[in-house]
Amino acid sequence: MALYCVGDIQGCDDAFERLLATIGFSPSRDALYVLGDLVNRGPDSAAVLRRCITLGDSVRPLLGNHDLHLLAAAYGTRRPSRRDTLQGILLAPDRDEMLEWLRHQPLARRVHHGGGDLLMVHAGVLPQWTAEETLAYAGEVEAVLQSREFAGFLQQMYGNSPDLWSPELQGTDRLRVIVNALTRMRFCSPEGRMDFESTESASEAPPGLVPWFDAPGRRTLNTLIAFGHWSTLGWLDRADVLGLDTGCVWGGCLSAVRFGTTLADRERYHVECPQAQMPGA
């Protein structure tokens, strides 16, 4: 079995199809982990979801901020913005099947491969969290999303406060911090206070902030973390982190990594993407 991770697809189904062909993906033999943001901004989000559903258990996605936004828009708790390209899902005859499938995906995954652990999230992991805590906290949100109370949670999910984790947090505040860390965070303070304003590259960190993966004392330092979300960061391949959002929807490329016999043995694949959105438009 070959193990792959792929970055943000964001509704670019043609690029997704070409990438699957490039890697020679076999649903009966391989596993493909999609690091969130399957939908939105690209031309055919519905086709991406249908393709993933058709490929069955061989495709194992995470929820990203755009996927949560789709759920909120679909269930009436968030108005679509003018830049959204979600109508193909919202008006589709199989919309309920796609939304239910998406709602039951996790916010974090971990896989043991070649003697090591790979932790996968869409955006980031707070420096205070261990890998085990990350999975447990993600599970708290997943339990609510997959319950009958999910619509109420989606209505209360949005907001930038609190921006600092405490294990004493409860209720909506606790779940919001977890969601924001896993699906929105790029920069944080050295003590883990999240910033939601800057979308610049890691080398242009605002004063007093660092990329989340460079926070001092990060407790997941010895676990390889694969993530997406940060298109201005681009491809990042370090011993401890692997960033795979290479800006497909912005005219960059859609990237995947194939792991060999160990997590350190990895190879990048990518396909070029036509520009579907103009930054700042």
UniProtKB/Swiss-Prot annotation:
The domain of life for this entry's organism is: Bacteria
EC top class, as a word:
hydrolase
**Keyword Nucleotidyltransferase among UniProt keywords:** no
CDD domains reported in the protein's UniProt record: MPP_ApaH
Catalytic reaction equation(s): P(1),P(4)-bis(5'-adenosyl) tetraphosphate + H2O = 2 ADP + 2 H(+)
Name the family the entry cites: Belongs to the Ap4A hydrolase family.
Q: Could you tell me what this protein does?
A: Hydrolyzes diadenosine 5',5'''-P1,P4-tetraphosphate to yield ADP.
The name of this protein is: Bis(5'-nucleosyl)-tetraphosphatase, symmetrical
